[in-house]
């Protein structure tokens, strides 16, 4: 693989990583059903993947050219991608622990896992990621080693900027890989294994003698589906990053082995960066709420088609009904937290916390409504078939939104 092919593929990955993960953050921003503790960690993971596309990949392309630079400047370029990798690892670990608590001790979940605590954990994860990734900047580097070839080519105090020339391989293997990549991955493997074993045991108990007050079988199955989706993301992370680390291990432990050819190194680097692209596809394929919100964003903001917003499988459609005096009528979808308008924007902060309201004036535009109205679900369905009906008001009974319900199988 030539350098021009490598650069072209890297740029394509960068664009896809930015677009896909911006879509994830956008979906969480506009859909209140996605605004929960677990998705705080998902957004943190998406932010790291956006930074890979914006910064890490351009840095990697720059380093691949072997340009002349001050050693510590080159070192910062080389280490920055390690910061983002570490942030992704910590986000995945936090998600695994969050799902473990949700399944093992569901009655205590809301008390233990709060938004404030989640944001604090995310902040700590990012601080630790910078500390671990930038450790070579503090002295664990090759800058003190004199390279006659670099001095001859680049001049005194400057080096040929290549990753292995500035970052020591013992740091990459012992510290970065063994301590902060492999160990967290094994921990996540153990957590998800315990999640599935606990869920299996609970499902068997429900079949034999269901106890009053326990979660229903369908709720637990949704939790398991959620855990499977996130376990897939962890598995893909390992699949994308382990080849590069395995090559580093061979380089470090087998001094007599032939160094990996450039095409293999390029392929391993591309595979590691491609991990930043795959997560949005997993969300879209496995998580119904994300999939519906992605469609809404693309159709409304990319294709410029105005259509009703869907959340949790229920349509938030505008009911064109008003009285003969022209007074406004609104449709409230019960069971939801603060929601979104039909055009995808957030509701007013003064809305009731148990639902969102679509106000329709005489002109049919969404606006504030003086009163909420409720109708049977059957009439709502009939109203969709006969949009010209006047005076029919609809109540769409939507169950309380929970994070696990987003993961209900399609």
Curated annotation (Swiss-Prot):
A Pfam family the protein falls into: 7tm_1
Topological domains, Cytoplasmic: 30-39, 98-117, 194-229, 286-410
InterPro entries per record: Adeno_A2A_rcpt, Adenosn_rcpt, GPCR_Rhodpsn, GPCR_Rhodpsn_7TM
Residue pairs linked by disulfide bridges in the UniProt entry: 68-154, 71-143, 74-161, 254-257
A biological process from GO: synaptic transmission, dopaminergic
Bias type Basic and acidic residues, positions: 371-388
Bilayer topology term: Multi-pass membrane protein
Record topology, Extracellular segments: 1-4, 64-74, 141-168, 254-261
Purpose: Receptor for adenosine. The activity of this receptor is mediated by G proteins which activate adenylyl cyclase.
Protein name: Adenosine receptor A2a
């Amino acid at each position: 693989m030539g350098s021009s092919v490598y650069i072209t593929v890297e740029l394509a990955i960068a664009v896809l990583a930015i677009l896909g993960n911006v879509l994830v953050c956008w979906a969480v921003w506009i859909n209140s059903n996605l605004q929960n503790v677990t998705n705080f960690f998902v957004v943190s993971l998406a932010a790291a993947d956006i930074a890979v596309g914006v910064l890490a990949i351009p840095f990697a392309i720059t380093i691949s050219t072997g340009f002349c630079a001050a050693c510590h400047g080159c070192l910062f370029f080389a280490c920055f991608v390690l910061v983002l990798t570490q942030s992704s690892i910590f986000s995945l670990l936090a998600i695994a622990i969050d799902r473990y608590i949700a399944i093992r001790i569901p009655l205590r979940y809301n008390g233990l896992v709060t938004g404030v605590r989640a944001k604090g954990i995310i902040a700590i994860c990012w601080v630790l990621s910078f500390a671990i990734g930038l450790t070579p900047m503090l002295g664990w580097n090759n800058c003190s080693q004199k390279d006659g070839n670099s001095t001859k080519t680049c001049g005194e105090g400057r080096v040929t900027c290549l990753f292995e020339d500035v970052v020591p391989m013992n740091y990459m293997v012992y510290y970065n890989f063994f301590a902060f990549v492999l160990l967290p991955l094994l921990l996540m493997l153990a957590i998800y294994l315990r999640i599935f074993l606990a869920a299996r045991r609970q499902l068997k108990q429900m079949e034999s003698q269901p106890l009053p007050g326990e979660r229903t079988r369908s709720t637990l199955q949704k939790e398991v589906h959620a855990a499977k989706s996130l376990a897939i993301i962890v598995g893909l992370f390992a699949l994308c990053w382990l080849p590069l680390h395995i090559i580093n291990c061979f380089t470090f432990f087998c001094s007599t082995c032939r160094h990996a050819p450039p095409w293999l190194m390029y392929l391993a680097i591309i595979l590691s960066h491609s991990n930043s692209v795959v997560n949005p596809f997993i969300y879209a394929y496995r998580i119904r709420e994300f999939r519906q919100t992605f469609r809404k964003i693309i159709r409304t903001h990319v294709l410029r088609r105005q259509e009703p917003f869907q959340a949790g499988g229920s349509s938030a459609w505008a009911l064109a009904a008003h009285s003969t005096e022209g007074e406004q009528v609104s449709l409230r979808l019960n069971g939801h937290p603060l929601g979104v308008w039909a055009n995808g924007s957030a509701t007013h902060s003064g809305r009731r916390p148990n639902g969102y309201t679509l106000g329709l004036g005489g002109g049919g535009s969404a606006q504030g409504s003086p009163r909420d109205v409720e109708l049977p679900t059957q009439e709502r369905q009939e109203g969709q078939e006969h949009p010209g009906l006047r005076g029919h008001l609809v109540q769409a009974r939507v169950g309380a939104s929970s994070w696990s319900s987003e993961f209900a199988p399609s």
